[in-house]
Design a protein with these regions (language model features):
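Active-site lining segments of carbohydrate-active enzymes
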Residues: 1-58
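Extended polysaccharide-engagement surfaces of secreted carbohydrate-active enzymes
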Residues: 41, 48-264
Length: 264
């Protein structure tokens, strides 16, 4: 019983790391992490919610409600035609990440559906992925907007003095993605538009952005040019910024009426 109490204590909407009021998930500061740490959180919580359902150790209703909020107001929005939005994934955006993370999230939602029949119809709609719902949602805690129409999907990822940009060059993941949360806008129809694209992108010319043509130098090139970090070490890549630091602009945000929205 004590162990279950410890597990479920994390299932609450909070201002710090974890589930946010807007349905997003933060980790490593005020940073959108639905496809990385948030996905692991969803998988673990859905698993234990299903295992313990119908027993004296079942999750309290308010804890299940927090998990339901994360799914219906978060994950439901960022999966399109079986693909996870790259902009919501965090730093793990490598090969097959969109389909792999979408499958993992949908499996977790299927487990939650068994434990939370009260919202079974809504979970079933997410799992079908054939008749995507429409609407607009601004994730105000995360500087992120999603717009869904019957035949296409669009999203914008931003950062401000209130949020942390997507982390880069951590465990060699997203090594070139310094600007990936600087106003990038992605549009999907089939869902395959960005499949395995990260190895081919010019990371100083990302869609939706106006970026400086900053040269990207490898570790070998940095060594030859004697470029050093503040610590004195040779950088692995030059196109990087210290993670867990908030953005620099206050003029970032969005408005939404649930159908239409605007982001800047």
């Amino acid at each position: 019983r004590h162990a279950v109490a410890e597990i479920t204590s994390e299932l609450q909407v909070r201002n710090g790391e974890g589930i946010q009021e807007d349905g997003s998930f933060h980790q490593h500061g005020r940073q959108l992490q639905l496809g990385n740490y948030g996905l692991g959180f969803l998988q673990s919580m859905s698993y234990w919610n299903r295992i313990l359902a119908g027993t004296p150790l079942a999750f309290p209703p308010e804890r299940t409600e927090a998990l339901r909020h994360l799914v219906l107001n978060g994950y439901r929005w960022v999966i399109w035609n079986g693909r996870f939005d790259l902009l919501a994934q965090g730093r793990q955006i490598g090969r097959n990440s969109q389909t792999g993370k979408a499958k993992a999230a949908l499996r977790a939602i299927a487990a939650l559906q068994k434990a939370d029949p009260e919202s079974g119809r809504l979970y079933a709609e997410i799992l079908r992925q054939k008749t995507p719902f429409t609407g607009n949602r601004h994730f105000f805690n995360s500087d992120y907007m999603v717009h869904r129409r019957p035949s296409w999907y669009a999203s914008v990822r931003m950062n401000s003095t209130r949020t942390v940009p997507v982390e880069d060059r951590i465990n060699w993941e997203n090594a070139l993605g310094r600007y990936f949360s600087d106003g990038v806008m992605l549009i999907m129809r089939s869902g395959d538009e960005y499949r395995d694209i990260t190895a081919c992108w010019d990371w100083t010319r990302l869609p939706g952005t106006t970026l400086p043509a900053t040269p990207i130098l490898t570790e070998q090139e940095c060594r030859e040019l004697k470029i050093k970090e503040a610590s004195g070490k040779t950088p692995r890549w030059t196109l990087s910024r210290h993670w867990r630091k908030t953005g620099e602009s206050e003029f970032t945000g969005g408005v939404s009426d649930g159908t239409r929205g605007a982001a800047v």
